[in-house]
């Protein structure tokens, strides 16, 4: 989280439990990511949080690094991989056209963004009216993001490289998987850890 108070008061207890039951385990920290740029909390020109997507990442990265320093722990740099995918994308994600999205009728959904790795659409049933309402998720990883995150974890936890990854889900093209693997590999290789595995 970009808000340190969301976990500063809770992670010490979690670490205490882990160290009690698994004293020899390495504690690592999963770094999350900033929301999609069309989330109203970070959307320009007037985000409700008062800052944009890049500033959200800067703040959450600072909080994760502070926690990692306190624990002498490594960070799984998923959020950094998300940032790299945004920087390297052939075009900038600008969000979905609301008029286009409104034409969809349950159970059909708009296609996933071929650019952004965060966000998707789903239907939920309104408990009062019983009607299906489309909801846009602008903060969880979509299928592309989940694949990239899996690549980050695999390379981070097992010391592997992108060349070791051969699985490509049917929903992702080989070209896109190469792009996502490349972002994941760069993140794992280049993220400046506060602790080295050899320490």
Q: Could you describe each region identified by the protein language model?
A:
Residues 1-143, 164:
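Alpha-helical cap/lid subdomain in secreted, periplasmic
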Residues 62, 143-155:
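A structural signal for well-ordered alpha-helical segments within the folded catalytic domains
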Residues 167-199:
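A cross-kingdom marker for long, charged
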Residues 155-167:
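Substrate-binding/catalytic groove segments of enzymes
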């Amino acid at each position: 989280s970009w808000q340190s108070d969301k976990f500063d008061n809770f992670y010490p207890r979690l670490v205490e439990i882990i160290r009690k039951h698994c004293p020899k385990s390495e504690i690592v920290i999963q770094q999350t990511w900033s929301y999609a740029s069309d989330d109203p909390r970070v959307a320009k020109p007037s985000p409700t949080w008062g800052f944009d997507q890049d500033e959200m990442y800067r703040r959450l990265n600072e909080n994760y690094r502070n926690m990692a320093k306190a624990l002498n722990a490594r960070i799984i740099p998923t959020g950094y991989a998300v940032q790299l995918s945004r920087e390297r994308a052939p075009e900038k994600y600008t969000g979905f056209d609301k008029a286009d999205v409104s034409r969809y009728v349950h159970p059909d959904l708009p296609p996933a963004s071929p650019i952004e790795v965060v966000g998707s659409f789903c239907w939920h049933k309104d408990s009062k009216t019983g009607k299906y309402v489309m909801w846009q998720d602008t903060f969880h990883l979509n299928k592309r993001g989940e694949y990239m995150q899996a690549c980050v974890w695999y390379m981070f936890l097992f010391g592997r490289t992108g060349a070791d990854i051969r699985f490509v889900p049917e929903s992702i093209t080989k070209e896109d998987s190469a792009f996502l693997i490349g972002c994941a590999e760069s993140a794992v290789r280049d993220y400046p850890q506060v602790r080295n595995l050899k320490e």
